[in-house]
């Protein structure tokens, strides 16, 4: 068996509620979960158990992991606690942050790495990526950053 270790944070007062939601997701995805966490600081590490030798289970585990991180955000937490974003959590960053907030991330990155040579494509999702995932919010019929090509 294989496992996927997630890393999200939640307000400590919502731990029981989040564990209940993770249990519901476990049933929905038909994958077992071993919940480990730092209860004192609200840092969760659900271990999603699956068999990579079974067609589709790896993708199913990844989808379940993304849903767990969405639950963390819904509960007032974040998509990452101590393990960072990298590429694994780029899509869930679109759930937690809006376009203006992501632009602040990019502004900081440009200030320190104007040539974009330090871990390009990692840590901050592009606005195009968020748009493709449905993470961009259209308000009053106005699309933010209309110059970005979309399909």
Ranges and model annotations:
Residues 1-151:
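Conserved glycine-rich FAD pyrophosphate-binding loop
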């Amino acid at each position: 068996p294989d496992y996927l270790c997630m890393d999200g944070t939640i307000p400590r007062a919502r731990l029981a509620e989040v564990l209940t939601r993770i249990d519901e997701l476990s049933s929905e995805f038909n994958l077992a979960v071993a919940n480990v966490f730092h209860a004192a600081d609200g840092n969760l590490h659900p271990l999603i158990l699956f068999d990579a030798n079974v067609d589709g289970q790896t993708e199913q585990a990844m989808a379940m992991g993304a849903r767990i991180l969405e639950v963390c955000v819904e509960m007032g937490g974040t998509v990452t606690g101590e393990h960072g974003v990298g590429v694994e959590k780029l899509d869930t960053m679109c759930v937690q942050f809006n376009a203006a907030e992501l632009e602040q991330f990019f502004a900081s990155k440009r200030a320190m790495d104007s040539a974009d040579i330090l871990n390009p494509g990692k840590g901050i999702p592009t606005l195009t990526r968020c748009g493709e995932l449905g993470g961009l919010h259209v308000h009053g019929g106005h699309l933010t950053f209309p110059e970005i090509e979309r399909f």
